[in-house]
């Protein structure tokens, strides 16, 4: 029985890890193709939400998903996407967790994306 619990926990954590990794990558790609910072942030959140729900992981953003310096959305600039998810361990009742589950594991993913030199508002970064 303990071995079964270990396997169940490993599968749950792996599913969440795959979900946050995919969410970070998809959010970065959605932001990069948006055309502006405001619509990019919305698209990034939607893409991350979709990727997480595909893996059956509940998620809601805690602040901005896309981390960038001045978010100028100029070609050649790079930005980071960080996604965190707290998953509940298997067989732990929801009522025991409350709003912040102590019987859980936090899984994180980071993805860095660079805007194409000809993307964005027409301004090109000196690095292009």
Feature locations, PLM:
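Short, conserved structural patches
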Residues: 33-128
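Alpha-helical assembly-interface signal, strongest on the long, hydrophobic N-terminal helix that forms
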Residues: 1-49
């Amino acid at each position: 029985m303990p071995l079964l619990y270990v396997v169940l926990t490993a599968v749950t954590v792996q599913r969440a890890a795959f979900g946050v990794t995919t969410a970070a990558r998809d959010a970065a790609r959605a932001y990069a193709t948006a055309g502006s910072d405001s619509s990019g942030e919305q698209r990034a959140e939607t893409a991350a939400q979709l990727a997480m729900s595909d893996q059956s992981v509940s998620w809601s953003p805690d602040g901005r998903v896309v981390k960038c310096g001045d978010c100028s959305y100029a070609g050649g600039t790079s930005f980071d996407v960080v996604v965190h998810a707290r998953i509940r361990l298997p067989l732990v009742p929801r009522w025991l967790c409350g709003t912040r589950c102590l019987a859980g594991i936090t899984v994180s993913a980071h993805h860095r994306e660079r805007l194409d030199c000809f993307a964005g508002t027409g301004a090109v970064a000196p690095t292009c």
